[in-house]
């Protein structure tokens, strides 16, 4: 889902992808996804002609997603499972589970994986438009080392770049700094 010419355009999951080059990271296969941030952008800047969100995934991750989907484990509806009792395998009990919630319960907590992350995130915004009658393109970005983020907070870079700016914004708001001109 992305915004173009005043309307939302729907696509199939991971249908649109292409290599994009990220500063200090290099080229990565990038996938067009929906993200809440573009909803906020088009609401607050109604003259935007196109707003899209791209994200990268490693091939192994995409293979895991395909496997989870193919096994029916990405379902969010409740199913009934007939399970043998631990103390009496011959006796069975019917248990209701939501497959995706079950996966969440048995897979490692993402918070516990940060120590093994390496490399860096690269989050940016490419802005293209007219300024003084001439087409201009700007790219504002932030890179974050997973290792440095983990050393500082015990979290990997994606969590760091999500949580730290929100915390700083909240702190500035409550100290009255956010309301000053230019902020």
Model-derived regions: residue spans:
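C-terminal catalytic/substrate-binding lobe primarily of soluble NAD(P)-dependent oxidoreductases
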Residues: 1-183
